Curated annotation (Swiss-Prot):
This is Lipid droplet-associated hydrolase. One of its GO terms (biological process) is cholesterol homeostasis. The gene is LDAH. The active site is at residues 139, 271, 300. Its EC number is 3.1.1.13. Belongs to the AB hydrolase superfamily. LDAH family. GO terms for cellular component: endoplasmic reticulum; lipid droplet. It comes from Pongo abelii. It is an enzyme of class 3 (hydrolase).
Length: 325
């Protein structure tokens, strides 16, 4: 019965130009244009998912569907790709808005700072200013979420969930010690290798490889993320990853303190990107905060097998807030 309900949940795919970059947005629910919807039935709140790196929004569809269902299908759940991590298929129209057409191009939009500005640009041009927001950041998406709150404190955010948050000491983490030399010093070798191996590869073979991989990982392929094997997208993910290792160093305690009442941190016990000691440190510094340690051994990449569990946790935490909407 539960699987049947999930199949009925509408998910609308759009490719838009945001800050000058092609961007995939997956919209869960019947609402596709909140900005121009003036009807009385327009929802008062948007749940907005910001992915980790690579920022393939298609990976988050099962999670978005589960969350949409658990919130009684009353609120849209949207997931945005990172700039440069998704390219529209040749037969897909790229939508633009007059605001985005006139907007200043974001400097280094594929880098750490550019990705933050990219998300803010999307909210400015596609979400009404008076619409309440629930932000869900996963991995480096948690860092983006904190930075968005810091840069635009007037955003009408009622809650922000930081899942397996890579918000500090990334290069010192177990995975960071491996990734740093690869992403910061050897990435040009990776770029060249990727282009030589993947660029000549026919689309049919890429599609077959991706679909097989998704089956192994038990991920839905409703929106097949061909960009996984697109050299341009992989290069942008590596570029972002290199900046993460170098720049995500010190935890932004000032921003955390300012917005603590609306923040929920969710750390893993087996997370090589943000080990348990990071949880212990932030818990000690902010004992009054909603800072949780996973008790279910859910891995950093929860979207592979644990979408329902994470959606359950968030929906349960939101009950009181959503009842007031």
């Amino acid at each position: 019965m539960d699987s049947e309900l999930k199949e009925e949940i509408p998910v609308h795919e759009e490719f838009i130009l945001c800050g000058g970059a092609e961007t995939q947005v997956l919209k869960c629910g019947p609402w596709t244009d909140l900005f121009n919807d003036q009807s009385v039935k327009r929802p008062k709140l948007l749940i907005f998912i910001i992915p980790g790196n690579p920022g393939f929004s298609a990976f988050y569809v099962p999670f978005a569907k589960a969350l949409y269902s658990l919130t009684n299908r009353c609120f849209p759940v949207w997931t945005i790709s990172h700039a440069g991590h998704a390219l529209a298929p040749k037969d897909k129209k790229i939508l633009t808005t007059s605001e985005d057409s006139n907007a200043q191009e974001i400097k280094d939009i594929y880098g750490l700072n550019g990705q933050i500005e990219h998300k803010l640009a999307f909210l400015r041009t596609h979400v009404p200013k008076d619409m309440k927001l629930v932000l869900i950041g996963h991995s480096v998406g948690s860092y983006f979420t904190l930075q968005m709150l810091k840069r635009v404190p007037e955003l009408p955010v009622i809650r922000a969930f930081l899942l397996f948050p890579t918000i500090e000491r990334m290069s010192e983490s177990p995975n960071g010690r491996i990734a740093t030399p690869l992403l910061c010093w050897s990435r040009y070798v990776l770029y060249v290798t990727g282009y030589l191996l993947l660029k000549p590869c026919p689309e049919k073979i890429k599609s077959l490889l991706i679909r097989r991989g998704l089956q192994v990982m038990n991920l839905e392929n409703e929106f097949s993320p061909l960009n996984i094997l697109e050299p341009f997208c992989l290069a942008n993910a590596a570029h972002l990853g290199g900046q993460e290792m170098m720049e995500v160093v010190k935890r932004d305690d000032e921003t955390i303190r300012e917005h603590l009442c609306k923040l929920t941190f969710y750390y893993g016990t087996i997370d090589p990107w943000c080990p348990k000691e990071y949880y212990e440190d932030i818990k000690k510094d902010f004992p009054e905060g909603d800072i949780r340690l996973c008790e279910k051994n859910i891995p950093h990449a929860f979207i592979i097998h644990f979408n329902q569990e994470m959606a359950d946790m968030i929906a349960d935490s939101l009950k009181d807030d959503l009842s007031k909407m």
